[in-house]
Structures are given as C-alpha cells and as structure tokens.
UniProtKB/Swiss-Prot annotation:
It comes from Streptococcus pyogenes serotype M18 (strain MGAS8232). One of its GO terms (cellular component) is cytosol. It comes from the Bacteria. SUPFAM superfamilies: Class II aaRS ABD-related, Class II aaRS and biotin synthetases, YbaK/ProRS associated domain. Pfam families: HGTP_anticodon, tRNA-synt_2b, tRNA_edit. GO terms for biological process: prolyl-tRNA aminoacylation. Its main location: cytoplasm. GO terms for molecular function: aminoacyl-tRNA deacylase activity; ATP binding; catalytic activity, acting on a protein; proline-tRNA ligase activity; transferase activity. Homodimer. Its EC number is 6.1.1.15. Keywords: Aminoacyl-tRNA synthetase, ATP-binding, Cytoplasm, Ligase, Nucleotide-binding, Protein biosynthesis. This is Proline--tRNA ligase. It is an enzyme of class 6 (ligase).
Length: 618
C-alpha cells in the first residue's frame, strides 16, 4: 500500500485537549479524528487495526461454535418496555421518535433484540443451545465523553448471546467464552487480568470482567526505547533523564476502574466487588453502659475520634441511603469506606442513592455528623459491614446534634444484617488467604455474564423441556469493546523514543510500538529519496518480494524530507522499518526493529531471510 494514497494526517505536536497518551497518539499519528464530542472517525490505519482484531475474534469464536449475525442498531422502544429497561436504563439511552410519533432507541446493548428473535424462532429444548454474536456500533449518550475512544457516544462492540435449556449447559458455554476471551486478548498482545465483576445494568448474576492493565510509567526500561546512538540509560545525562521522567509522568494513567489482585494467587476483582480475608473475633472486654457525651463542632469521624481520644477503628460510621424509595441505614467501622455496589447488590435494589440532609434529619432527628444506630424506630433496616460486629464499646452518633454515644455494642444496642459492604484496602490479605491485595488501574475490554432468566422471564421467552413443560430460556451475554481495544493497546505499547543527534543533543518523542498481531501493516518500507531511480526500483522489488511472502507493507513513496518520514514512522508504530537510502546502489538497506530500537544493514537479497530470523527473536 502506497502511503501517498492513504489518509494519514499526522500532526507535528500533541493535541492540546488530550489527557491520556492513547488519545494523543491516535490523533497525532493520524489514526482517528473527532467528528463531534464523543464521536470519532476511524481513519485507514485505525480501521486496519480494528479489522485485524475482528479477525482474531472470529477465529477464536469459530472454535467454540459461536455464529456471527447482524441485528439492527435502531430498535423499537416496545422491546425495552417488555424487559423493563426503557424506564430504568437512565439518561444514557438515546431515545427518538419516527414520523408516526412511535418511540425508538439507538441500541447500547441488544439483549432484548436477540431474546425476541430466539423467542419467536425456538420452541423446543432440542433447538438449543444457540450461540450468536455480532460486531456493531453501539450508542450511549455519555454526559461527559473523554479520553479518546475510552468514553464515547458511539463505539464498536462485539456482543454475543447464548441460549440454553438449563444452567449446566450455560456453564459450559460461559467457560468456553472465558477461555476464548483469554486467547483473544493474549493474541492481541494485551497485558490483562480476568477479574470478578459486577453485572450492572446488564442484569447479570455471575460475571467476569477482562481488564487491560495500565501501570504507572515509572519503569524506564519498559517505557523508553533508545536509538542505536545511545548505548544505555547510564549514558544519558542526569538532567535529561529527569526530563524524560517528567514527560512520562505528565500523561494521566488511563483506566476508569481500579483492580484489586493478590500478590500470590489468581484472585483478582474490580474494586467494586473485591473482598478481603475476614476472621470474626470474640469479644474479650466487658460491655460498658451507654453514655451520651457532647461533641461540639465534631462532624467527621476523625474529629470525633480526636475529641474523645479514641482510635477511629473504635467508632461506627452511620450512613443513610434510599434504596428503591425505602430508607436503609448502613454501618461501617469508622476508618472504612462504603462500597455502594456491594450494598446495592445485597439489597437487590434497582436504585440506590445517598439520602439528603433533610431526609437524614427526618429519619434520625439529627443532621450529618451525629447519626447512629441506637434507638432507631422499630422496623428500621440496618445493614452493617461484617467488621462492625467485632466492635466492643464503640462510639456512634447519638442522633442528637452535637452529641455522640460511647459504650455502643452490636447485638445489645442494635440489631443489624451483617454483610461485606466496605471497600477493601491495599495491603489487606487476599480472601483466599494467599498473598496481599495490590491495586492497579485498568481499562475494561471485555465482560461476560450469566444472565440466567432475567430477560426470558420478563419477555416470555420459553421452550418446551424434555417433559413437555414450558420453561424460560437460560441466557448468557458476552461483550468486547472493540474500539476500546485500540486505546488499550496504545496505552500499553506507547513508548518514548530517545536518540542522540550528531551534535550531541538528546531528543525524545512519543510513538507507538504496535504488537505485530494488531499493527495496521507489518513493515514500513521507506524510500529516502524518491527522485533516485535506483532507490525507487529497489523499493519496488522489495515491496513485491515482501508481499509475496505474506507481509502487509506500507510503502512511504512521498516526496518529503527524510526526517519527516522517520518521525511519521515512529508515530505510526509499525513493528519493522526498512529504509532504502544512500546505499541503494550497493543493494544495501537498513532494518530497524521498533520494539528495541535495534537496527542493522543487510543486503537487499537477504532481507526476507533476515526478517524471518529477527521476527522470531522479537
């Protein structure tokens, strides 16, 4: 492919509105362009990478018997009313009307559509299982699109749906998808973890998320690639190294999710779902009587603890939530933080939100800062974190402004439902007892769910079982954020390329180091002087030879300065660069491996053989 024929609008500078490196490089390297807020055009390079990823997906899904189809993106609202999601999905749902004033939506997901198709076509358990998927643009009216392709209003997604006559059959397909996802993300060159996830708006029960890890850019050996002009990091002056470190740190670490994972086992979970090892403790101290004490101007746990000279771990944090229009009191040990996802899941609530100051005062008789679990109205629902039951003689709000109560003892002074509703902390023991929890940032690139009968129940999707009884179809759901993959790969494979000029100056610039499986082309073939006919002829021969051996070749045939060509090549990030330069008449070309910065000169006749050796090594 001739570069002069492609739309690759590279920029000389990083875009000023980009906060994460993947967004900046996709724009600067000419992969994408924003059409409007949260809506992007995928230019030829990005489209080629996405198509390569689609090929990987299709190959792996064929192995597990998944069949591709295509459903409409424009959906009637009636289907979503059947499932109940039209009213509950929220403001992110694009709603529109046609000329007949009928309600439609632009699909963010397609559970209802696939359920309807199968409901109308499948009548017997003998027709199951079915394993269907599509690759399609989805739509979500994001309030604040940001970070390039990571949070957009239109995005490309692979969504798959499986249909079964029982849960045992679903378990088999769910495991098939889990293994297929691992194979897909491994082939794509991603550093990822499969973690325990939350079903969220999808309505799933069991679920697993696949997160591309986005580590901090502190390891110079990982993030910096040295040109052959620099032997090692030790040769770079200290002041230049500090500049490089500052440049690495200047870009925000992307990843809207925090992952908690064990240092010694396979345990990993989204922070929203992560738990830790818990061991109940027996009370050894005698229970004191309740004593009301004045705590003037103390509104926070740390202020109360300091005023009463107690540790924060001896205090009870009392919060009020409204769950599906019903008040729920949540209790935590004072130095812990509430995990609202855990609480919402435990309550099986559709809506959960913190109560207002006015609602709290109406319920407790006091404002924030003085709330507590003692002497609440009969029938009040109290959900306490499991650690609370280990407390003896704790401090809690007295439900009276400016007062607290000491000597509070769970069981004696209040009754509660005990469950894990706290946010875990880094360094705590893993729940499996092996290793401690560490945190990392991550980008969600895939998610699989066991939907069960969530949609078949609400939409009447039934089959006749072995005994001729009508039973609901059991479903699974499997998604991959296709356009997000491009961002995730660049976040992990962006590199700062450093070289030394003949004058001894050090230069550094960002570029992409694409893994070969997803690179838009395999080889960047550059002619230094397009007016040199010998070089042109050699370039044409090498291009033909490479293509005959199965290489995708991008040939830079532009009449541009060589410095501009090399700069664009570093930005675009193809794995191999072959330069036809001043030694073309001698039949000598230069090979440069992008991942390492290594370069060698070879006879053009030996190019293919040399590339085969080098690509095996790297």
């Amino acid at each position: 492919m001739k570069q002069s024929k492609l739309l690759i609008p590279t920029l000389r500078e990083m875009p000023s509105d980009a906060q994460v490196i993947s967004h900046a490089l996709m724009v600067r390297a000419g992969y994408v362009r924003q059409v409007s807020a949260g809506i992007y055009a995928y230019l030829p390079l990005a489209n080629r990478t996405i198509e390569k990823f689609k090929t990987i997906m299709r190959e792996e899904f064929e192995k597990i018997g998944a069949v591709e189809m295509l459903a409409p993106a424009l959906l009637t609202a009636d289907l979503w009313r059947e499932s109940g999601r039209y009213e509950t999905y929220g403001e992110d749902l694009y709603k529109l009307k046609n000329r007949d004033n009928s309600d439609f939506i632009l699909g963010p997901t397609h559970e209802e559509t696939f359920t309807t198709l199968v409901r109308n076509a499948v009548k017997s358990y003998k027709q199951l299982p079915l394993n269907l998927y599509q690759i399609q643009s989805k739509y979500r009216d994001e309030k604040r699109p940001r970070n390039g392709l990571l949070r957009t209003r239109e995005f490309i997604m692979k969504d798959g749906y499986s249909f079964h006559h029982n849960y045992e059959d679903l378990d088999v397909t769910y495991e098939d998808y889990r293994q297929a996802y691992e194979a897909i993300f491994t082939r794509a060159g991603l550093d990822f973890k499969g973690i325990i996830g939350d079903g969220g708006a999808m309505g799933g029960k069991d679920s697993q998320e696949f997160m591309a890890i986005t580590p901090a850019r502190t390891d110079l050996d990982r993030w910096v690639v040295l040109d052959k002009s620099i032997a090692s990091m030790d040769d770079i002056p200290k002041e230049v190294l500090e500049e490089i470190k500052a440049e690495l740190a200047a870009w925000m670490i992307s990843g809207e999710d925090t992952i908690a994972y064990s240092t010694e086992s396979s345990y990993a979970a989204n922070l929203e779902m992560a738990t830790n090892e818990y061991k109940p403790s027996s009370k050894v101290a005698a229970e004191d009587a309740l004593v009301e004490v004045e705590t003037p101007h103390c509104k926070t746990i740390d202020e109360v603890a300091a005023f009463l000279s107690v540790d924060e771990t001896q205090t009870i944090k009392t919060l009020l939530f409204v769950a599906d229009n019903e008040p729920v009191v949540a209790l935590l040990v004072g130095n812990d933080h509430i995990n609202t996802v855990k609480l919402k899941n435990y309550l099986a609530a559709d809506f959960l939100e913190p109560a207002s100051e006015e609602e709290a005062r109406a319920f407790f008789g006091a404002g924030f800062g003085s709330l507590g679990p003692v002497n609440l109205a009969q029938g009040s629902r109290i959900v306490a974190d499991r650690k609370v039951q280990n407390l003896t003689n704790a401090v809690a709000g007295a439900n009276k402004d400016g007062f607290h109560v000491t000597g509070v003892n769970p069981g004696r002074d209040f009754q509660a439902e005990y469950v894990d509703i706290r946010e875990v902390k880094e360094g705590e023991m893993s729940p499996d007892g092996h290793g401690v929890l560490q945190f990392a940032r991550g980008i969600e690139v895939g998610h699989i769910f066991k939907l069960g009968t969530r949609y078949s129940d609400s939409m009447g999707a039934t089959i006749l079982d072995e005994n001729g009884r009508a039973v609901p179809i059991v479903m699974g759901c499997y998604g991959i954020g296709v356009s997000r993959i491009l961002s995730a790969v660049i976040e992990q494979h962006a590199r700062l390329f450093v070289n030394k000029t003949p004058k001894g100056d050090y230069r550094y610039a960002w570029g992409i180091n694409f893994p070969k499986e997803l690179a838009p082309f395999d080889v960047h073939l550059i002619t230094v002087n397009v007016k040199d006919q010998v070089a042109q002829d050699l370039t044409a021969k090498l291009e033909a030879d490479l293509m005959a051996k199965g290489y995708d070749v991008l040939t830079d045939d532009r009449n541009e300065r060589v410095g501009s060509k090399f700069s664009d090549s570093d930005l675009i990030g193809l794995p191999i660069r072959v330069t036809v330069g001043k030694k073309a008449a001698e039949g000598i070309v230069e090979i440069k491996i992008k991942a390492t910065g290594d370069s060698i000169e070879v006879n053009a006749e030996n190019l293919i053989e040399t590339l085969e050796i080098l690509t095996k090594e790297h």
